[in-house]
Amino acid sequence: MSIVLGRGQCGAHITLLFTIDDSSEDLVYQGSRGAGICLKDGVEAIAKGDNGSGEIIVRFKDGEYDSRMYQDVLSELVEEIPEIGDFDWELDIIMSLPTSQGFGMSASGAVASSMAIQRAIGIPHEECVRRSFLVAHIVERKRSSGLGDTTALSSGGVERRIAAGSPFSGSLLDNGPGVSQGLSLIHISEPTRQFAI
């Protein structure tokens, strides 16, 4: 095998209001209903894989952060795609917003890193995106962190989460129990006219 490279990016999310729904034992069905705003800024991840046994080294561009979440992302991916475990991974993380400030940066980082690793081995774009949201949701719930950030991020814009759970699940990753709707606004204005006096 040769060295493989992949990149993933995911914006952040600010929750405005929410209700918790964690009554199911199945992590895929846990989450929240609510509303929030998705941001363009978030996390960029660059993955480099080389022959190995599924080890991971995580480097952060600015600052020191806990890398265990990224190890959890890799573990979940190996369960989904065993071939990923045939590589040792280097993951470079670039954060454009602070952590632990309500921006959903753990969800953003989990989605971005999952995308980067899958893209490195050539997983098709849509499958990669859907699986990344599922993996991020499971990692977030196992770590008792985000409840609805991944579902919100799957919609984008100003979002409302109608049903709790992962936005994608199942063997075809075609839908989840989680449902969200995103609204994006585009403002188009006419050029200002200048008049000579």
Where are each of the predicted segments found?
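Charged catalytic carboxylate motif
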Residues: 69, 73, 112, 187
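Acidic/histidine-enriched ion/cofactor-binding microenvironments in catalytic or ligand-binding pockets
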Residues: 168-182
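A short, sequence-level motif marking secondary-structure junctions
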Residues: 63, 166-167, 187-188
